[in-house]
Structures are given as structure tokens and as C-alpha cells.
């Protein structure tokens, strides 16, 4: 079952895009990652009716765990562990080609090792290894 009605979903999505627009972020690509990456067939259908496509990050890459903090116990993943996962995945036969990476813009204050502080170094190294970073529209065409 769903936790939201179609009307509340449509209203919420429209308000979120309106707020992003007010802040100067244009979402002309029509892709979005649903809150908590939670969605099902109905959400996909409703999104498509609005002209949007829900997407998700690529599994296996644990960057989305950058929101976690030590008090979460087994669900916590340190920035060292997240980064090691990136380098491990990059060494696989297809590497990180085509990966959609989710990194949170902000995290809980209880997380002291902010993964986003490492992004510049990681991106620079991946570029040296030949990776290119592309817009989601280019990736999914």
C-alpha cells in the first residue's frame, strides 16, 4: 500500500519543484529521486502523468549511506568505508561506468566525518582515471 494519496503526492512534488525553482535550481530534465528512494509502480505512473521520471542511485555503491551516524549502529557507514567502496567498484570490469551516485548535501550533526568533504579529491582522482561526469539526461538517453 501507499502512504500518500495521489493528490498529496502531486501537491508535494509540485511544491518541491516550485521551491527549487524559487531558489534558482531549474529542473528542466524532469528526473528526480523520490524521498528516501521509496517508490512503487503507482508513484512511477503518477510521476509520468506529471511529466517526471523517478530514478534511483546505482545499488552496490554505498554513497547514499553518507547520512548515517555512529549512533545508528550496524546501519552506520563511515566515510572511509564509503570511499573504499568507490575505489573497489572502480576496479571492477565495467568500473563505475553508468553509475548514478547519490550524495546528500547535508547530514546529521552527529556525523562528524562528512563524506561530501571528500568529493573534490575523489572526483579529481576519478577524472585522472578517465571517468567523465555527465548530466543525468545524457546518461539516460
Which sequence ranges carry the predicted segments?
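Catalytic domains of cell-wall/extracellular-matrix polysaccharide-remodeling enzymes
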Residues: 1-102, 106-127, 131-132, 138-141
Amino acid at each position: 500500500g501507499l502512504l500518500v494519496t495521489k493528490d498529496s503526492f502531486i501537491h508535494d512534488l509540485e511544491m518541491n519543484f516550485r521551491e527549487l525553482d524559487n531558489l534558482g535550481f531549474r529542473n528542466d530534465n524532469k528526473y528526480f529521486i523520490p524521498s528516501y528512494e521509496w517508490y512503487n509502480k503507482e508513484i512511477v505512473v503518477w510521476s509520468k502523468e506529471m511529466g517526471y521520471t523517478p530514478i534511483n542511485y546505482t545499488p552496490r555503491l554505498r554513497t547514499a549511506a553518507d547520512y548515517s551516524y555512529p549512533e545508528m549502529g550496524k546501519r552506520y557507514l563511515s566515510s572511509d568505508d564509503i570511499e573504499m567502496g568507490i575505489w573497489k567498484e572502480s576496479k571492477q570490469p565495467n568500473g563505475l561506468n553508468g553509475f548514478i551516485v547519490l550524495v546528500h548535501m547535508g547530514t546529521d550533526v552527529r556525523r562528524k566525518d562528512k563524506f561530501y568533504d571528500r568529493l573534490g579529491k575523489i572526483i579529481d582522482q576519478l577524472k585522472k582515471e578517465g571517468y567523465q561526469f555527465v548530466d543525468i539526461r545524457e546518461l539516460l538517453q
